[in-house]
Swiss-Prot record:
It is found in: Cell membrane. It comes from the Bacteria. The lineage of its organism: Bacteria, Pseudomonadati, Spirochaetota, Spirochaetia, Spirochaetales. This is Uncharacterized protein BBD24. It is a multi-pass membrane protein. Keywords: Cell membrane, Membrane, Plasmid, Transmembrane, Transmembrane helix. GO terms for cellular component: plasma membrane. The chain crosses the membrane at residues 1-21, 35-55, 56-76. It comes from Borreliella burgdorferi (strain ATCC 35210 / DSM 4680 / CIP 102532 / B31) (Borrelia burgdorferi).
Amino acid sequence: MTAIIVYSCLTMCVIYFHLQLKTFFTKLIRFCKKCFDIFLLLIEMLKLIFYLLIINNKFYIFIIISIALITINTMI
């Protein structure tokens, strides 16, 4: 009788630990995906800014400023 109670308690502990581990890794993967997506977005915006600086037109300075503001808002 005691062995059944101990076995069921151990099983519940293992299941609880497994669920906690699974949710931790799920949150970690989501966080890494989010950071990686923001990193790729920043690289694309940096390429666009360099392209617009090469063109050297006064209108594109406003576009660069707006892109910088959008980037700052996404990082916050």
